[in-house]
From Swiss-Prot:
Organism: Tolumonas auensis (strain DSM 9187 / NBRC 110442 / TA 4)
Keyword field contains Transmembrane: no
Protein name, entry field: Probable Fe(2+)-trafficking protein
Summary of the function given for this chain in its UniProt record: Could be a mediator in iron transactions between iron acquisition and iron-requiring processes, such as synthesis and/or repair of Fe-S clusters in biosynthetic enzymes.
Residue ranges that the Swiss-Prot or TrEMBL entry lists as coiled coil: none
Gene Ontology BP terms: cellular response to oxidative stress
């Protein structure tokens, strides 16, 4: 049986993740409050951020930036802003 959560990002009841993907308190918060669909959306945004801003995950400052953006995206209804990016639907 699938574990259901009320997703804070999508504001609906949806299937939760099978296990905690991020360590620590933030990971617990994500596991308890974010659904699979919202996590998949975040992973796409995360990839864009890493590529467009040329982030190096070995750099602590870059990891901190990515974590801040993740928290804004998942819990504060923020969206990832990438300078010069125009979504395909707006071209």
């Amino acid at each position: 049986m699938t574990r259901m959560v009320f997703c804070q990002r999508l504001k609906k009841e949806a299937p939760g993740m099978a296990f905690q993907l991020v360590p620590g308190e933030l990971g617990k918060r994500i596991f308890d409050n974010i659904c699979q669909e919202a996590w998949a959306e975040w992973q796409k945004k995360q990839t864009m951020l890493i590529n467009e801003k040329k982030l190096n995950m070995m750099n602590a400052e870059h990891r901190a930036l990515l974590q801040t953006e993740m928290e804004k995206y998942l819990f504060e209804d923020g969206d990832v802003q990438i300078e010069g990016y125009v979504p395909p639907s707006e071209k």
